[in-house]
Amino acid sequence: MSREEVLVSTDWAEQNLNTDGVVFAEVDEDTTAYDGGHIPGAIKLDWKNELQDHVRRDFVNREGFEKLLSAKGIGNDDTVILYGGNNNWFAAYAYWYFKLYGHSDVKLLDGGRKKWELDGRELTKEEPNRAATAYKAQEPDASIRAFRDEVVDAIGNKNLVDVRSPDEFAGKLLAPAHLPQESAQRAGHIPSAINVPWSKAANEDGTFKSDEELKQVYGEAGLDTDKDTIAYCRIGERSSHTWFVLRELLGHTNVKNYDGSWTEYGSLVGVPIENPQEQGA
């Protein structure tokens, strides 16, 4: 898949802010970031309150996704451009959601909010008022999502890519350092997993590294491109970014995102775990 099919530049974005059929949407870890200023015409997608089920741990179901996108004024034929802060990590999470429900024309703004701001481009607090649509989603695409049983079976057989920080992988932390350390019952990583922090795929300005650089990053870490791959992190957002890199940029079609990730796996009873911190004690 060429980059033009899944990425747009900030130049392209600025030239297409008012193009019919193009919808910009901001998705941030900090769901209030949009309110302080966003790309003109962009809508807000709240990953926590709008893309997640409020009762069970799962994403919104098909009907919920249809209702959300209809209310946001997104049509089935629209080109959706997703962007956000911190190298697009939650924008990539939303991209994965859109692909799960079959929206074919969705792309990331290369560099996200960081690149847009570094360029000195306009931000506004004005919120758009888009007419509602009647969006229709497809059934979830099971080929891009991994569940716990498949993950356990993958140990020693498939590529397991832990995209968390080295300290999380080593069992020193349960979550990123700036977050509460209470997401899983146990620390460590899935046996046979390689550690390739998701942020290694990004340049300083938030844009993605070149294909050659990305291949080197994963090749040096020991990724076997002949095997199926499952990426995981803590809740599935950082691993969505790695899933995007491996599948959409590098063209590995046999890649799944395990959105249960360490929050689920680290709390399962009886599954194997490697924890260098405990083993070295």
From Swiss-Prot:
Top-level taxon in the UniProt lineage: Bacteria
This protein's name: Putative thiosulfate sulfurtransferase
Species this chain originates from: Saccharopolyspora erythraea (Streptomyces erythraeus)
Presence of the UniProt keyword Repeat in the record: yes
Pfam families: Rhodanese
Keywords, alphabetical: Repeat, Transferase
Gene responsible for this protein: cysA
Domain notes: The structure consists of 2 domains of very similar conformation, suggesting a common evolutionary origin. However, the sequences of the 2 domains are very different.
Reaction(s) the record says it catalyses: thiosulfate + hydrogen cyanide = thiocyanate + sulfite + 2 H(+)
EC number: 2.8.1.1
